[in-house]
């Protein structure tokens, strides 16, 4: 085990504070509509330009072990806020820095760190209660667009795209952000359920121009096993032929005699049929087939459930208004499933999302949820250069998470105003002793930091702006740093999602109070470089003849 370097008390906190300041100062220049860009060096390719707080925070690694510990703790604040609300990372970092600075001063002055922490916790509780009380539900499409615009740094085009996407796929729908191949940013919406499996044989194609299978008012057979024998399928095919409706088969695979018969029947026009492979693998495949069954009002045919294919009748098949299959994807639109069944399945998937600890599983569950609940929207971000596209994509990502958060918990006045107003409520918080009171005071001072920083980034005097905002009683009154005017923030469309503001203060206070209560730090001592090998003896060059 290598030797360790141990620091105590004031020295430990000072080194840690230096790291906090380096990271926070790099991140906070991005705050607000007039925030600046940060250029990140990449080991290969062009440098990356971003205005996203968490992206900057993740790049920072310091040489000094103790400073680095402080920086990494604050980086945790930014990434936790990004995970929970998808935005508000810079606000959280600014708040954490302000609380740590004031807290470190109080500890150095001899106050009890644990009482300071209790005071901070009491203050945060009161702030969150005030934010929730003043939160306003998002009702209109315009408000969603405003939230998106603010998060995308005042880019109203991005706000409008997000509002359109949410309108089309619903609040539960999946919105993905990709890089476009063109200069323009565009929105592409897939309604209904789409999965990434195409037709098994091109002979099933009905629209030769687009190389696509299109079927209206189709029956859907959902089978878990491979289909190779024709005998087990025959009774069902005869029943479907009599209805005159098309049939789509979703199975692990269709091969041999079964595939040949289906293709021949399709070409002779006796039966409109198409077959696709089942999506996913293993347990996820079973779950997705069950989703398709619930969406279409059919049954997943599985021998585990004791259902044999030869015993299947028409009532066990799913139905859909339209099914489209191309080489790579299958889309089922307007399935005939009962609304109550679909809602129950959605609730079940939501519960699984809450419980899962794996990011990959969560992402896959959210995809399944979207396919059941609404659809998938893809925003393709365009730009003149690769650097511009990446920077824009960062902003669209932020804005997408912010609009989701706004729909979930409502909105508050932006520009740091909601936190400023909440600081006024802390005067009435009751504490048990003076040290706890100081803890509350630390948070009260810190709550003005985001509004002050936004003003500083816009070239104004932060303290003057904060003073003027607090002079007015009106809750939504604040400073629009884009235009330089004092306005009603909500009616001007400068709004923040409640969830973003709430998680920012909770995460900042949580990590900051840990830093304040730190009394010792342990880091590995840098290893001394081993001495190099001795030089060979001087003289002639070895192995040479003269």
Curated annotation (Swiss-Prot):
Family (UniProt): Belongs to the chaperonin (HSP60) family.
InterPro entries the record matches: Chaperonin_Cpn60_CS (IPR018370), Cpn60/GroEL (IPR001844), Cpn60/GroEL/TCP-1 (IPR002423), GroEL-like_apical_dom_sf (IPR027409), GROEL-like_equatorial_sf (IPR027413), TCP-1-like_intermed_sf (IPR027410)
Domain of life: Bacteria
Functional summary from the UniProt entry: Together with its co-chaperonin GroES, plays an essential role in assisting protein folding. The GroEL-GroES system forms a nano-cage that allows encapsulation of the non-native substrate proteins and provides a physical environment optimized to promote and accelerate protein folding.
Any one of the GO BP annotations: protein refolding
Protein name in UniProt: Chaperonin GroEL 2
Assigned EC number: 5.6.1.7
Family annotation (SUPFAM superfamilies): GroEL apical domain-like, GroEL equatorial domain-like, GroEL-intermediate domain like
Quaternary structure (record): Forms a cylinder of 14 subunits composed of two heptameric rings stacked back-to-back. Interacts with the co-chaperonin GroES.
Amino acids binding ATP: 30-33, 51, 87-91, 415, 496
Assigned keywords, A-Z: ATP-binding, Chaperone, Cytoplasm, Isomerase, Nucleotide-binding
Keyword NAD recorded: no
Signal sequence range: none
Gene: groEL2
Pfam families: Cpn60_TCP1 (PF00118)
Regions that span the bilayer: none
A GO CC term assigned to this protein in UniProt: cytoplasm
Catalytic reaction annotation: ATP + H2O + a folded polypeptide = ADP + phosphate + an unfolded polypeptide
Subcellular location: Cytoplasm
GO molecular function: ATP binding; ATP-dependent protein folding chaperone; isomerase activity; unfolded protein binding
Lineage: Bacteria, Pseudomonadati, Pseudomonadota, Alphaproteobacteria, Hyphomicrobiales
């Amino acid at each position: 085990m290598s030797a360790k370097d141990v620091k105590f008390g004031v020295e430990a906190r000072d080194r840690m504070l230096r790291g906090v300041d380096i990271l926070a100062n790099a991140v906070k220049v991005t705050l607000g509509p007039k925030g600046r860009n940060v250029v990140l060096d990449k080991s290969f390719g062009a440098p990356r330009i971003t205005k996203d707080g968490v992206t900057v925070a993740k790049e920072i690694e310091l040489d000094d072990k103790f400073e680095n510990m402080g920086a990494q703790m604050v980086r945790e604040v930014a990434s936790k806020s990004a995970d929970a609300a998808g935005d508000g990372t810079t606000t959280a970092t600014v708040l954490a820095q302000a609380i740590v600075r004031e807290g470190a001063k109080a500890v150095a002055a001899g106050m009890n760190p644990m009482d300071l922490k209790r005071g901070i916790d009491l203050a945060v509780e009161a702030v969150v209660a005030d934010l929730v009380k003043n939160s306003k539900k998002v009702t209109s499409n315009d408000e969603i667009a405003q939230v998106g615009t603010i998060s995308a740094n005042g880019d109203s085009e991005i706000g409008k795209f997000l509002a359109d996407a949410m309108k089309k796929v619903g609040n539960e729908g999946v919105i993905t952000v990709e890089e476009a191949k063109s200069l323009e940013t565009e929105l592409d919406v897939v309604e209904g359920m789409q999965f990434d499996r195409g037709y098994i044989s091109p002979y099933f194609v009905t629209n030769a121009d687009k190389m696509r299978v299109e079927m209206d008012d189709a029956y859907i057979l959902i089978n878990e096993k491979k289909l190779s024998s024709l005998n087990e399928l025959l009774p069902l095919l005869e029943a479907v032929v009599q209805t005159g409706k098309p049939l789509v088969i979703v199975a692990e695979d269709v091969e041999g005699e079964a595939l040949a018969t289906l293709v021949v029947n399709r070409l002779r026009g006796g039966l409109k049929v198409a077959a696709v492979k089942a999506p996913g693998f293993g347990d996820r495949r079973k779950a997705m087939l069950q989703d398709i069954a619930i969406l279409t009002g059919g049954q997943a045919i599985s021998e585990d459930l004791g259902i044999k294919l030869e015993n299947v009748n028409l009532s066990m098949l799913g139905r859909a208004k339209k099914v489209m299959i191309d080489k790579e994807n299958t889309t089922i639109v307007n399935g005939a499933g009962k609304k109550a069944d679909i809602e129950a399945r959605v609730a079940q998937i939501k519960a699984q999302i809450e419980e899962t600890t794996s990011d990959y599983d969560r992402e896959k569950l959210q995809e399944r949820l979207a396919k059941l609940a609404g659809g998938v929207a893809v925003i393709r971000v365009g730009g003149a250069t690769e650097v511009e596209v990446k920077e824009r994509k960062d902003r669209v990502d932020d804005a997408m998470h912010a609009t989701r958060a706004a729909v979930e918990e409502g909105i508050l006045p932006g520009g740091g105003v909601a936190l400023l107003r909440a600081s006024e409520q802390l005067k009435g918080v009751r504490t048990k002793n003076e040290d706890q009171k100081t803890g509350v005071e630390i948070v009260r001072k810190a709550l003005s930091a985001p509004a002050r920083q936004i003003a500083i980034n816009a070239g104004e005097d932060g303290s003057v702006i904060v003073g003027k905002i607090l002079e007015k009683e009106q809750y939504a009154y604040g400073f629009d740093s884009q235009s330089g005017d004092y306005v009603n923030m909500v009616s001007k469309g400068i709004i923040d999602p409640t969830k973003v503001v709430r998680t920012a203060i909770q995460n900042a206070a949580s990590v900051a109070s840990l830093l304040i209560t730190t009394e010792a730090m342990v880091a590995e001592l840098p290893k001394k470089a081993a001495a190099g090998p001795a030089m060979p003896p001087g003289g002639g060059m070895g192995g040479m003849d003269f």
